[in-house]
Amino acid sequence: MPTISVLIKPASGMCNMQCDYCFYCDEMKKRSQDSYGFMSEQTLKNVIRKTMIHAEGLISYVYQGGEPTLRGLTFFEKAVEYQRHYNKHGIRVNNALQTNGYLLDDAWCKFFKENQFLIGLSIDGTKQLHDMYRHDKNGNPTFDRIKSAADLMDQYGVDYNILTVVTQNAAYHATEIYNYYKRIVFFWCKI
C-alpha cells in the first residue's frame, strides 16, 4: 500500500530567526505578498480529513516552514485530534516537524513525546560555527537557546534528528562538527 506524505507549512515562510543563508528571506522579498499568513484550523482539518479518506497505508504529515512552531502548540494539538477523529480504518500515522528549536519548552516537548513526533532540530555544529550564521531577528546568537531545546528534548525522551546546513565553512570543519556531535551525545538524536 502506498504511503501518503503531506508537507504542511503552518506558518508559510515566517520565521523568528534570521539565518544568513536562508533562502526564505530573499524569496519573501520577491513575492507580491511576502507572507501568506498562518494556515487556518479549517484548512488543517480539511487536509487531514481528505488524506484519511484516501489512505490505504501509512500517512506521514511533515510540518516545515519558515518556522512551524510559530503557529502555536494548539494547532498541532488540533492536528492530532483530527487525525484520531478521521482515522476510521486504523491507518498508521507519522508526524514529523522541522524546527529551529527557538520556541521549544516543556509543553512542546511533552506533546512531542506523548504523540510520537519525530523532530528535526536545526543546529549547525559547535557554538562558534552555529552562531556565525544563525541569529535571531535582532542579530543575536542562538546556539545556547537551541542547545537548551535539545537538552529539553533529551529530558523528555523526544526522538529527534539534527539538521546541519553544510556551508563552505562547515565543510572545512566537518570533522570538528562530527566529533562535537559524538562528544555531546544528543541522547535521542540519530547521527
Language model segments and positions:
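Active-site neighborhood of divalent metal-dependent phosphoester/pyrophosphate hydrolases
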Residues: 66-67
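Canonical Radical SAM [4Fe-4S] cluster-binding loop centered on the CxxxCxxC motif
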Residues: 2-42
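Radical SAM/AdoMet-radical enzyme domain recognition
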Residues: 48-49, 53-62, 71-191
